[in-house]
Amino acid sequence: ERKQIGPMETLEFRQAMAGAKHPWRFTAQNMSDGTLRALGVLTALFQRNPDHAPTLIGIEEPETALHPAASRALREALNRAAKHTQIIVTSHSPDLMDDPDLDADTVRAVIAEGSETHIAPLDSGSQDAMKQHLFSAGELLRLNQLAPDPENILDQQRQVSLFGEIEP
């Protein structure tokens, strides 16, 4: 619930407590960072204004400050929202990626080489392991085996310049 405090507004959270006649009330400043971040992520994912709904939502490390046990609920929310809009998520969290139904074709791996960063689809070994349900993306990440496809990286290095010339 929105609550007016002088010229400013905050959110007021209510929590039903066993044995209490009325719910406990907390303002946003008394809530954990993880709770507030989760609320922000859920708000971004489930906006339903048909005139202004986003076609793309980017979320960087949505699991930050979130209890690891909440990763599954966050994954489910991301999957539900992805049915209505394109969502790009960056994460270092194996817990968030521990979904056996995560499609290997939707995962991208990042590698830093020198002063360059490359983003590419997974290499064939990682894709096969996921498609055969031998490992989840999270398990591969824990084992340091989630790798980008080297052929795709080579293709990226042969980019067309601004004026149409192919660079080596």
Language-model region placement:
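Loop/turn-to-beta-strand initiation segments
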Residues: A53-T55, H67, A82-I88
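Extended helical coiled-coil dimerization/tether regions that scaffold
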Residues: E1-N30, E151, E165-I166
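C-terminal lobe/lid and adjacent interdomain/linker elements of RecA-like ASCE P-loop ATPase modules
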Residues: A73-P168
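GG-anchored amphipathic helix commonly corresponding to the ABC/SMC/Rad50 NBD signature/C-loop
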Residues: Q15-K21, T27-I59, A69-A73
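Active-site flanking residues adjacent to catalytic metal/cofactor-binding acidic residues
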Residues: I59-E60, S91
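A generic structural signal for well-ordered coil/turn residues at beta-strand boundaries
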Residues: P7-E9, T35, D103
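ABC ATPase nucleotide-binding domain "signature" loop
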Residues: E61-L66, L96
